[in-house]
Amino acid sequence: MAAHYDVLIVGGGIAGLSLASALAGSCSVALVEAEQELAYHTSSRSARQLIPSYGPEVVQELTVRTLELMAARDGQLPEPVLTPRSFMLIGSEESVRAEASGHMSPITHDRALELCPALVPGAFSAAGLDTGSFGCNAPLLLADHRLRAEAAGADIITGARVHSAQRLGSGWEIGAGQEAFEAGVMVNAAGAWADEIAVISGVEKLGLQPYRRTAAIVDVERPLPEQSPMVAAADNSFYFRREGEYVLISPVETVPSGPEDARPRPGDIERLIVRLNQVTTLGIRDVRSAWTGLRTEAADGVPVAGFDAEAPGFYWLAGQGGYGFQTSSAMAELAAGQILAGQGAGLGAGSGAGHSAGAAHHPASRTAEALAATRWSIRR
């Protein structure tokens, strides 16, 4: 016999977990995750930096709102999720100007070297600084969302890969692992697998494209000072930041991939180490660990949050690209407001409870329109 819920969320990464914690208590919620552990793929492989100056305008707006929501929650946690950590962009005058936004201020060459003495002076000619950027304790944030969701009555089921889904009356019938579910709303928060979930559900896919993003923790001869900013090349060729006594580095590659358990490819990190040892005095010695995540994007590079145009009760929460953590709380707030308002499928008694969850971002807002799954620019 199928278990019934108002909302069933497919995907246990930061998107699905943050939505589960936003919805639970206002309606009945289940979250199913294909892997045996939550946040296994992209969310556990994040750079853990929230950058208001990063991404398109709507992403920057979502980031500011996410930081507000996380800061409010920090006061209720035993340790903070957010830690101030500036973000510095370096490169040519032209490239820095092209990548900078209103959240970033230009700084002098000398000031950039003061902030990050490891930089070789001749390696860049211009720099910009975002002092509103924060480091993120991703494991703590994920755990808090799970605890809040479960405390409010949500059921979280791991090792339950969705293998079937179809419309049933006014809702959905979903098979995941050995379990059967019925739900008024099905939320597709499956990351790199979001298009596959759509196809399984008989819904037209959006043409979402996963891209590889590799990172590594390296041992260095000269560790970065404690207050060092995260440093990124304006030409998107690398970034690095302090990770305790070590340094986190990334080649910032944009290589298309299928949905998979991605792994570093031979040469990616080695080539980056050669480059960083030319533009910094870090003296990278050994690779302690390396990993590859998948960041999945829509054709226009903007995340997707909204009901499908043709499939009632099918809600897209996908395509976050490299902005997953920094937009997560704001996108969950928006999605909860739309779902609880009963768009696409009624939730009975729960439908009136969504006004507080989504008050800051009304479903008819400009932000909602920019993220809508019905927008013309989304499909490839």
Model regions: which residues?
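Helical element adjacent to the flavin cofactor pocket in flavoenzyme catalytic cores
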Residues: G132-A180
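N-terminal Rossmann-like FAD-binding beta1-loop-alpha1 element of flavoenzymes
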Residues: Y5-A30
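Glycine-rich FAD pyrophosphate-binding loop
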Residues: A24-S43
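Active-site substrate-recognition segment that forms the wall
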Residues: S21-A22, R48-L50, P78-T83, A190-G313
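Dinucleotide-binding Rossmann-like beta1-alpha1 core, especially the glycine-rich loop
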Residues: A47-A118, G122-A126, S237-Y239
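C-terminal catalytic lobe of FAD-dependent flavoproteins
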Residues: Q278-R380
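Short hydrophobic core segments
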Residues: L8-V10, F181-W193, A332
